């Protein structure tokens, strides 16, 4: 539910708040984010906890999207890709590494303790954002719904979002069920599985940073190699079954490949916005969280269907097919982006 609300609310808020200044949005989203975490920590029952998660899902993507728009203004073009990769790397590691820590704390102490830890981080980080981010900038000019929505009609933006749908979906067919995979297929205990997930998170961080380095040097064309390797890793999981330690080699290889494509797609979205839709920079930075979380929901749903029908051992094979679809979409996006650049130059 969190991922679904996140995916829907992020672009909706970007489109509907274009008339407000960016710093005002940053403050408002930060306040709601902290209050959502406070309610979650104090939740007396599951119903209140569920509502707090919906509130958090509704502003988390918007807060991330607004924050990312500061990066091109604070850093040089050469540093932007790496900075974006660090931001999304931290986000990705939180989904894997910190989730494992939270699960461990909840299992050994109490789930409220884990929520208080989350609240503490929320207060510290949001406080730092509000205190140190510039009050004004290039993206503060008011924008109407129509001025922003034009970005979503660009063909290469549409295919770029589909890259996320199938690229993220290919991994989450497997990763959505990684814990039962580790325990049922590889025969790990609870502690071993948690340790493996923490190591997986470290590889995910490396994946994001490496993705920034690759994007700065090779751009989107590097994804044509990335998705072939990702398909190979997923097929490897299917082929080796529960054979240890070979299966772990493919698991960690997949973690290393998992986010290599993210920065290149984000850079593409923001480049298109900067060159042809300059008032839609916040929306451009919202596209990734939206598409990413739709990909999570899509991949997890397909993975669930696979697990309940043919069995968890087949998630790798299905994920590999999605990786190849993402490869084809990357090729189309590269060609469309080239055509759009030529069209823009001709109109200049």
Which residues fall in each region the model found?
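Cytoplasmic helix-loop-helix junction between adjacent transmembrane helices
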Residues: 46, 52-91
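Conserved MFS/SLC helix-loop-helix module at the cytosolic interface between two early adjacent transmembrane helices
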Residues: 8-46
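Helix-to-loop junctions at the C-terminal end of transmembrane segments
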Residues: 9-22, 208-219, 307
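A late C-terminal transmembrane helix in Major Facilitator Superfamily
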Residues: 272-310
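C-terminal membrane-cytosol helix-exit motif in multi-pass small-molecule transporters
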Residues: 119-138, 330-333
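Helix-breaking motifs and short loop linkers at transmembrane-helix boundaries and internal kinks
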Residues: 21, 42-48, 59, 76, ...
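Extracytoplasmic gate region of multi-pass secondary transporters
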Residues: 157-198
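Paired small-residue
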Residues: 35-39, 47-56, 245-253
């Amino acid at each position: 539910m969190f991922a679904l609300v996140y995916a829907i609310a992020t672009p909706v808020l970007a489109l509907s708040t274009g008339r407000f200044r960016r710093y005002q949005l940053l403050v408002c989203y930060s306040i709601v984010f902290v209050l959502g975490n406070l309610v979650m920590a104090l939740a007396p029952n599951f119903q209140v906890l569920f509502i707090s998660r919906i509130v958090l899902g509704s502003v988390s993507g918007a807060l991330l999207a607004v924050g990312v728009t500061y990066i091109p203004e604070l850093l040089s073009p050469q540093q932007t890709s790496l900075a974006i990769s660090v931001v999304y790397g931290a986000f990705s590691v939180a989904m894997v590494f910190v989730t494992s820590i939270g699960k461990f704390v909840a299992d050994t102490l109490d789930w409220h303790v884990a929520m208080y830890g989350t609240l503490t981080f929320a207060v510290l980080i949001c406080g730092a954002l509000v205190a140190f981010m510039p009050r004004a900038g290039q993206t503060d000019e008011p924008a109407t719904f129509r001025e922003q929505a034009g970005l979503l009609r660009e063909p290469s933006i549409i295919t770029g979002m589909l890259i996320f749908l199938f690229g993220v979906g290919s991994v989450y067919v497997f990763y959505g069920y990684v814990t039962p995979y580790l325990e049922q297929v590889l025969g790990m205990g609870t502690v071993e599985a948690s340790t493996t997930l923490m190591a997986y998170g470290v590889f995910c961080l490396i994946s994001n940073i490496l993705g920034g380095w690759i994007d700065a040097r090779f751009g989107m064309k590097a994804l044509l190699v990335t998705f072939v390797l990702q398909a190979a890793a997923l097929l490897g999981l299917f082929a080796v079954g529960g054979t240890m330690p070979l299966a772990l080699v493919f698991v960690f290889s997949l973690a290393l490949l998992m986010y290599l494509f993210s920065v290149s797609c984000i850079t593409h979205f923001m480049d298109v916005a900067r060159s042809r839709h300059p008032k839609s920079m916040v929306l451009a930075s919202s596209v990734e969280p939206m598409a990413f979380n739709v990909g999570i929901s899509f991949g997890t749903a397909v993975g669930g269907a696979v697990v309940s029908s043919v069995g968890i051992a087949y998630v790798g094979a299905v994920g590999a097919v999605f990786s190849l679809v993402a490869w084809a979409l990357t090729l189309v996006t590269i060609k469309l982006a080239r055509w759009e650049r030529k069209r823009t130059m001709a109109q200049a």
